[in-house]
């Protein structure tokens, strides 16, 4: 018998996360490492667990994640979106609850490009009156 699993893709900044949800005991592995080992910061771990805590599914699933690109904050946000999408694939009734909490919305903010003639995206050289 094939293992039933639910899948969700999440993106944030330049990070992408592929999330696989299986019935289990609440183990979360990111790139073959436990969640606590992969993310050093507690805030990143908290962000990843938010959809599960909201839907009271913390101990119901084993989650396997492949995260690539970007930094830790971007990857944590991508994983959160992926978990939320996978939960909706598992149970459609959770969608309104997750949407209300803002976990179903892709954060569209991206890094603004650097412009020619400026130091950074908006930082210009100091203005001299004389």
Swiss-Prot record:
One of its GO terms (biological process) is translation. It comes from the Bacteria. One of its GO terms (molecular function) is RNA binding. InterPro entries: Ribosomal_Su5_D2-typ_SF (IPR020568), Ribosomal_uS9 (IPR000754), Ribosomal_uS9_bac/plastid (IPR023035), Ribosomal_uS9_CS (IPR020574), Ribsml_uS5_D2-typ_fold_subgr (IPR014721). The keyword Ribosomal protein applies. Keywords: Ribonucleoprotein, Ribosomal protein. The keyword Ribonucleoprotein applies. GO terms for cellular component: cytosolic small ribosomal subunit. Belongs to the universal ribosomal protein uS9 family. HAMAP family: Ribosomal_uS9_B (MF_00532_B). NCBIfam families: PRK00132.1. PANTHER family: RIBOSOMAL PROTEIN S9, SMALL RIBOSOMAL SUBUNIT PROTEIN US9M. This is Small ribosomal subunit protein uS9. It comes from Xanthomonas euvesicatoria pv. vesicatoria (strain 85-10). The lineage of its organism: Bacteria, Pseudomonadati, Pseudomonadota, Gammaproteobacteria, Lysobacterales.
């Amino acid at each position: 018998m094939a293992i039933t699993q639910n899948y969700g893709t999440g993106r944030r900044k330049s990070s992408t996360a592929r999330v696989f949800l299986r019935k289990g005991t609440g183990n979360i592995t990111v790139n073959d490492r436990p969640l606590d080992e992969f993310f050093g910061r507690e805030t990143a771990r908290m962000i990843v667990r938010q959809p599960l805590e909201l839907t009271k599914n913390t101990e119901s699933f084993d989650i396997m994640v492949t995260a690539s690109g970007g930094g830790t904050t971007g990857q944590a946000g991508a994983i959160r979106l992926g978990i939320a999408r996978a939960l909706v694939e598992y149970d459609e009734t959770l969608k309104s609850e997750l949407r209300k909490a803002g976990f179903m919305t892709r954060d569209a903010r991206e890094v603004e490009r650097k412009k020619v003639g400026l130091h950074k995206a908006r930082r210009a050289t100091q203005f001299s009156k004389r």
